[in-house]
Regions:
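PLP-dependent class I/II
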Residues: 1-298
C-alpha cells in the first residue's frame, strides 16, 4: 500500500536493547526526507535476537511514541518464552497503563497461539488488542473490516480461548498442565544454553544469551580473505556462509542481512527447537563446519 520502512538497529552490546536516541535520529532523518512516519514496531521478546526488553526500556519507548505521536505496535507472541534467571515478561499494555500514558499513546498489541510452550502453529490462532488514545473513527473502521472478513477458523478460536483461560488451581487438569508447561520451558532453556555455548566456543563468533523467544543470533567476524573473496564474487558474506552451511550439513539458518542488521556486522539466526538429543548433533555439525571454514581462510 505504498508504505516505506524506516529501519532502526538494536544495541547488541547492551543485550539488544533499544537505543531511543538512535531511533529518534532515524525518525528525524526520515521526516527530513519527506517521509510521514506513522508507527513503530517493537518485538518483545525479540525475533531474531532472542532478547527481552527491560521495563525501563519499554517505558522509554512508550514515552517516545507519546512525544512523537507514533502508533505503537507491540509484537508479543513470544511472551511465554522467557528463560533468563530473574527476568520476566512485561506487556507494553501494562507499561502504558501504569505510566498513565493511555491518553497519549495508541497501542496495538499482538499475541498468537503459534509460539509459547503450546506452539500450535497450524491452528492459526491469534488476536490484536487496541489500547489507549485511539481515534474512535479508526477503531470503527477496524471493526468494520473485521466484520466483513471471513470468520476465523474454529480450531484457532478454540485454541485462543484455551491460551487465554488455562486450567486454574483446583481444577482436575491443573497439575498436569503446570508440569507439561514447566517441562517444555525448562527443556527449551537447556537447549538455548547448549546451543549458545557451542556457538560461543567457535572462533570469531559471539552469541549473546537468549533471554527469550526461540532463537540464537550470533555475531560472526569473518576472515579478511573470505570477505575479499565475497566482494570479488559479488556475494553477501552471511548469505554465502549460511548457504554453505546448508549444503554441507543440512542445517537451515537465516542470514542476518535478511533482518536488516547494522551495516558492517554479520549474523545468522538459528533456532533451538530441535530436541535436546538432536541439539547435540546440531552443535557437532556446526562446530565441524565452522572449524573447516576458518581453516580454509587462514
Amino acid at each position: 500500500y505504498g508504505g516505506t520502512l524506516v529501519p532502526y538497529y538494536l544495541d547488541e552490546e547492551r543485550s539488544w536493547s533499544m537505543d531511543v536516541e538512535h531511533v529518534k535520529k532515524q525518525l528525524n532523518e526520515a521526516r527530513a526526507n519527506g517521509k510521514n512516519v506513522r508507527a513503530i514496531v517493537v518485538i518483545n521478546p525479540g525475533n531474531p535476537t532472542g532478547n527481552l526488553l527491560s521495563d525501563e526500556n519499554l517505558l522509554e519507548i512508550a514515552k517516545f511514541c507519546a512525544d512523537e505521536k507514533l502508533l505503537l505496535i507491540s509484537d508479543e507472541v513470544y511472551q511465554e518464552n522467557v528463560y533468563a534467571e530473574g527476568k520476566t515478561f512485561t506487556s507494553m499494555r501494562k507499561i502504558v497503563l501504569d505510566a498513565g500514558l493511555e491518553k497519549r499513546v495508541a497501542l496495538a498489541s499482538f499475541h498468537s497461539t503459534s509460539k509459547g510452550f503450546y506452539g500450535e502453529c497450524g491452528r492459526r490462532g491469534g488476536y490484536m488488542e487496541l489500547v489507549g488514545a485511539w481515534d474512535p473513527d479508526v477503531v470503527a473502521a477496524i471493526l468494520k473490516l473485521a466484520s466483513i472478513a471471513l470468520c476465523p477458523n474454529l480450531a484457532g478460536q478454540v485454541v485462543v480461548s484455551m491460551v487465554m483461560d488455562p486450567p486454574k488451581e483446583g481444577e482436575p487438569s491443573y497439575e498436569l498442565f503446570c508440569k507439561e508447561r514447566d517441562d517444555i520451558l525448562a527443556s527449551l532453556k537447556r537447549r538455548s544454553i547448549a546451543l549458545g555455548s557451542a556457538l560461543n566456543a567457535l572462533e570469531g563468533v559471539i552469541c549473546r544469551p537468549s533471554d527469550g523467544a526461540m532463537y540464537c543470533f550470533p555475531n560472526l567476524v569473518f576472515p579478511q580473505k573470505y570477505m575479499d573473496e565475497c566482494k570479488e564474487a559479488n556475494k553477501v558474506p552471511d548469505v554465502e556462509y549460511c548457504t554453505r552451511l546448508l549444503n554441507q550439513t543440512g542445517i537451515v539458518t537465516v542470514p542476518g542481512s535478511g533482518f536488516g542488521q547494522r551495516p558492517g556486522t554479520w549474523h545468522f539466526r538459528t533456532t533451538f527447537l530441535p530436541s535436546e538429543e538432536d541439539i547435540k548433533g546440531v552443535a557437532v555439525k556446526l562446530t565441524d563446519f565452522h572449524n573447516s571454514f576458518i581453516a580454509q581462510y587462514k
